[in-house]
Amino acid sequence: MKQQIQLRRREVDETADLPAELPPLLRRLYASRGVRSAQELERSVKGMLPWQQLSGVEKAVEILYNAFREGTRIIVVGDFDADGATSTALSVLAMRSLGCSNIDYLVPNRFEDGYGLSPEVVDQAHARGAQLIVTVDNGISSHAGVEHARSLGIPVIVTDHHLPGETLPAAEAIINPNLRDCNFPSKSLAGVGVAFYLMLALRTFLRDQGWFDERGIAIPNLAELLDLVALGTVADVVPLDANNRILTWQGMSRIRAGKCRPGIKALLEVANRDAQKLAASDLGFALGPRLNAAGRLDDMSVGVALLLCDNIGEARVLANELDALNQTRKEIEQGMQVEALTLWEKLERSRDTLPGGLAMYHPEWHQGVVGILASRIKERFHRPVIAFAPAGDGTLKGSGRSIQGLHMRDALERLDTLYPGMILKFGGHAMAAGLSLEEDKFELFQQRFGELVTEWLDPSLLQGEVVSDGPLSPAEMTMEVAQLLRDAGPWGQMFPEPLFDGHFRLLQQRLVGERHLKVMVEPVGGGPLLDGIAFNVDTALWPDNGVREVQLAYKLDINEFRGNRSLQIIIDNIWPI
């Protein structure tokens, strides 16, 4: 197949006013990621944006204060992903520490209840005695659920970060940084971030009302919950803007110091990660998937129970359960990828005539795993993808993943406007969204989605590209620089881990495992010998003993094994020269 991936180097903003004492490499990396001042590199909690800028907070805390005083039964309604689980656990733990004793939580089941505060979920909350519902990481599109709650006399506070539609649910209070009238500077808070800010505001209000003094309660340190904020923020793949970097760094610092929930400690253990050397990528690729596995295959209540439990023994039992679910998820995903191969082969043959956006469906696909499958197909074909699975009653549930240049939720909203009734419901963000439609509408949707994306997207964006930070000099290929880069994060969505490119002599190459290429390389212009590994290579192409020189896109890394540390490179892309 013709090489579709192009290499592009990041542009560096030469006008960025960064501290002169920063190493030149870091100044270059930060400036190319939109950092323009030292203030944006702040990591202390003092640098956090103030909660006072979130609209709706004052009304929400007043409702919660009255509920606390009157002993009102509060039910927190979460979501079935890692952000929803951490949001739920954080809200319950925070309100307990603030002096609320009559609180419980409910997490919708993906397969039985669907997403959000539906009327059915409201009925479940009502059956459990709910007198006030607080949604976390959902609710902004739950018009019917909020109306049903009102009909039962249950007020609702919505806390969410998903993009709102044209109309808002009739909740008593809504907190969402993406509301049109909200002046909160960061629009990238995860659901757990929104919940954390509400709890900060509530603590201040309770203190000002004399709540803690009246009851002899010590004012809680809510920073103890930042481990949950970090996990939910990274796992939900929201942009790591300056404010989210503070939240994530502070949470990671607590985890590294061993000051985290037993559930997070147990997840680190089953994932074989060293807490003291935690990177943001460990939250995203090791802990997040295990927590998400509960919501994908079973019930996220298991994940919330893990995050709430105070006993490390109990936490280990639950973490092992999640680890087993994650392994099952991997097996299901692998099976779905095998089923998708036939579709992929057809797509490969017709790549030149592929629509801009791909919609795919198989009657045996699992609705808890279609999002991951969509990500895999998107990476392969470099275009927006929505994968569908049967949801029963003649309907399909789809999960979409987009690329830079196409706002997935906006695209679905446009389709819903152009073709009323084709989509049953939808919601999401720029890069990921979910929707439902009737099975007999799939082919129509497939056609219309492909046409819309083709119309909206510049064809150049459909060519995969690797965005590099340029070359490293031989003098920068050291353990010290690798450690500097490790400490310079947290790296993540929209603030990517540094990726470099260069021209190397290929001195050794061999497969390890089934699909991993182990190499030794040397910069063509001279420099250190470097061990490297490329994961999941095309074994039809590699190893190739006829190749003597290669272009690499790589990350500088430290390999730690049995107490020994050595420099290595992690190869993202390898091109023969």
Listing of model-derived features with the role each one plays in the protein:
Residues 69-70, 314-320, 324-360, 393, ...:
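Mid-to-C-terminal polyanion-binding domains and interfaces
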